[in-house]
């Protein structure tokens, strides 16, 4: 009985803490920046500011995040909240993960020298793991310890979604290997929804990440929200916005 009471308290604290964390600040700040500033400025003055790039025809912008020296965000030019949106599994929706990977050069331009692909990670958080309600993929540095674990387990990552050995940052992750050719043709969101039964109707429970491996392939990572173990499904935990991996 005592264990059940303690468990209930833990869940209550986790939920309350997550709710308060989500409510702090303006959750629509990024949406206002994209729709009311970047897009308007590009259309009226051919100037993407305050974004670094605006691609209206392709449906996305690239924006320099204030957190970290090299972190950028890729965001749509129209309303999509996040991983929970059914738009992400529709074939006409842009392949945002691939577009984000193609936008990684902004990190090198900002740094003034090349940022190796092996040092870069893309992440998107779940609704309980984010502070903003406009879809955004984080383009930033990979944590050095995560890079080491991905390298050490490269041979165990298959073309199916399987548990990553030992998890990452204290949380369970599923991993799947994809080639560049696969990634160009099909969005990771569609791969997760179509290949993982528990994700199909509950995409909003998941956060995702992507990094390149030494053989040129990519590893997709997905973690599912589990408040019992204080996992808000925030794949951004795999990134280091201070970029120690470059030191």
UniProtKB/Swiss-Prot annotation:
It is a single-pass membrane protein. Pathway: Phospholipid metabolism; CDP-diacylglycerol degradation; phosphatidate from CDP-diacylglycerol: step 1/1. It catalyses: a CDP-1,2-diacyl-sn-glycerol + H2O = a 1,2-diacyl-sn-glycero-3-phosphate + CMP + 2 H(+). Its EC number is 3.6.1.26. It is found in: Cell inner membrane. Gene3D superfamilies: HIT family - CDH-like. InterPro entries: CDP-diacylglyc_Pase (IPR003763), CDP-diacylglyc_Pase_proteobac (IPR015993), HIT-like_sf (IPR036265). This is CDP-diacylglycerol pyrophosphatase. It comes from Enterobacter sp. (strain 638).
């Amino acid at each position: 009985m005592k264990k059940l009471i303690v468990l209930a308290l833990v869940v209550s604290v986790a939920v309350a803490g997550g709710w308060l964390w989500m409510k702090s600040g303006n959750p629509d700040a990024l949406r206002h920046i994209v729709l009311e500033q970047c897009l308007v400025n590009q259309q009226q003055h051919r100037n993407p500011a305050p974004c670094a790039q605006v691609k209206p025809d392709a449906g996305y912008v690239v924006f320099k995040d204030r957190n970290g020296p090299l972190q950028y965000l890729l965001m749509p030019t129209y309303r999509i909240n996040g991983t929970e949106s059914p738009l992400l599994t529709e074939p006409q929706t842009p392949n945002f993960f691939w577009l984000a990977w193609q936008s990684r050069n902004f990190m090198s331009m900002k740094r003034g020298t090349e940022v190796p692909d092996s040092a870069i990670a893309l992440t998107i958080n779940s609704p309980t793991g984010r502070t903003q309600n406009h879809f955004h993929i984080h383009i930033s540095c990979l944590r050095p310890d995560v890079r080491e674990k991905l390298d050490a387990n490269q041979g165990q990552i298959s073309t199916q979604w399987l548990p990553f050995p030992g998890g990452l940052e204290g949380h369970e992750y599923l991993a799947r290997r994809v080639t560049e050719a696969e990634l160009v043709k099909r969005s990771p969101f569609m791969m997760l929804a179509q290949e993982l039964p528990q994700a199909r109707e509950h995409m909003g429970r998941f956060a995702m990440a992507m990094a390149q491996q030494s053989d040129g392939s990519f590893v997709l990572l997905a973690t599912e929200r589990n408040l019992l173990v204080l996992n808000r499904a925030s794949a951004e935990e795999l990134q280091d916005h201070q970029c120690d991996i470059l030191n």
